């Protein structure tokens, strides 16, 4: 059995290398400084707007900050765009940012992200050579006291955000796109799919023109009812990820 994956082991602080946080190129807009507050002025992308062609990920990341293609931006702190190697052979797609991601602006830095790191290490895949993103770029939540609880995005919200994922894939040109969970799979395939039907198989997906692997989202491992079940689900996730070893270099 592989190393333990209890909740305590996943809760340690995760720190991303600051060198990976590229400052977006500021283009076709202007900014004002008011004391220490910088206000960016740019046009908003509404639901009816097609995305423009972007020269690179920095341009796409900056433009995504003004996305209004669905209402989720209204309650989110910020758009959480993808992060990582812009020439990665592997792109990992999750569901949406969580509370930690919404606050930091980076994908997969909360408990699910730390568990993903453990699984990638077990599968001998270097996360720093990968690109990680989400199918939906804003945190959807509902309040419970002082907490913000994750709420699953609707199919309309997934479809509204799908052009951003397609843009990331087109700019990176990865060899494999890895969908973590049902929402990611729906975005990749362009509609709902049963995870049981596609999990653990390298499959060509015509709509994005890429080989894809669908597996479980790390958060589903954390939700398993007891330590033994969590270990079983973690081991299964690692086994799926090992199918990617030939693309991990």
Where are these regions (language model features)?
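A polyanion-binding, active-site-adjacent surface
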Residues: 2-249
């Amino acid at each position: 059995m592989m190393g333990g994956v209890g909740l305590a082991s996943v809760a340690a602080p995760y720190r991303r290398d600051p060198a990976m946080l590229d400052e977006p190129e500021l283009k076709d807009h202007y900014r004002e400084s008011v004391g220490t507050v910088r206000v960016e002025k740019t046009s908003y992308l509404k639901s009816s707007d097609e995305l423009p062609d972007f020269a690179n990920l920095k341009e796409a990341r900056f433009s995504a900050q003004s996305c209004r293609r669905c209402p989720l931006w209204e309650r989110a702190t910020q758009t959480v765009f993808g992060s990582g190697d812009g020439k990665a052979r592997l792109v990992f797609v999750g569901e949406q940012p969580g509370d930690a991601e919404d606050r930091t602006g980076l994908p997969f830095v909360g408990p699910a992200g730390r568990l993903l790191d453990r699984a990638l290490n077990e599968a001998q895949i270097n996360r720093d050579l990968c690109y990680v993103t989400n199918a939906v770029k804003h945190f959807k939540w509902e309040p419970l006291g002082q907490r913000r609880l994750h709420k699953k995005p609707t199919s309309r919200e997934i479809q509204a955000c799908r052009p951003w994922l397609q843009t990331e894939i087109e700019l990176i040109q990865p060899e494999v796109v890895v969908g973590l969970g049902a929402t990611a799979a729906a975005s990749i395939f362009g509609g709902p799919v049963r995870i049981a039907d596609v999990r653990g198989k390298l499959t060509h997906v015509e709509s994005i023109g890429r080989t894809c692997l669908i597996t479980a989202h790390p958060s589903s491992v954390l939700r398993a009812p007891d330590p033994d079940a969590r270990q079983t689900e973690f081991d299964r996730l690692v086994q799926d990820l090992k199918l990617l070893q030939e693309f991990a270099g």
